[in-house]
Amino acid sequence: GSHLGIVMHPQGDAVVTAMQDNDLHGWRLADGHNMRMSGYPTKVRSMAFTRDGKWLVTSGADVVVMWSFTGSGPMGKPPVELPGSGGALCTRVACHPTQDVVAAGFADGSVLMIDIETRRVLPVSLNQGGAITALAYSPDGCMLGFGTEEGLIGAVTLASE
């Protein structure tokens, strides 16, 4: 199938692509080993590795889906699911550049920040105008920006601690 998106592992260990068929395909670059990650109800349109490369965080379900890239990688391991937004489809994800925190945007316009270890959720924006279509942290991690399909944009200043 055709590729919808691509993400590189931060240490250069792997490359992962989102496919037309609601799957992810990855390759370990050292040996070319093929990895398939499936089970999504819809196409994955957004994915990002955590800063340390331990997790691949993805949209495409009503929760935030994370695949482990420790040890031998995601094959044979179930994904970890982080909380969602009341059944709304996760449309965008972004990984914090210095902390183990994921930002996730949803089809209902909500933006959540989720601590990977504790699973604590911080609502950033709830039910704004349309699905979240853009989401990014600033390079220093002190701001989070988002945009919706209806043209709303937002930028939130985050505490430095």
Short names for language-model regions:
Residues G1-E161:
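WD40-repeat beta-propeller superdomains and closely related acidic/aromatic-rich repeat-like regions
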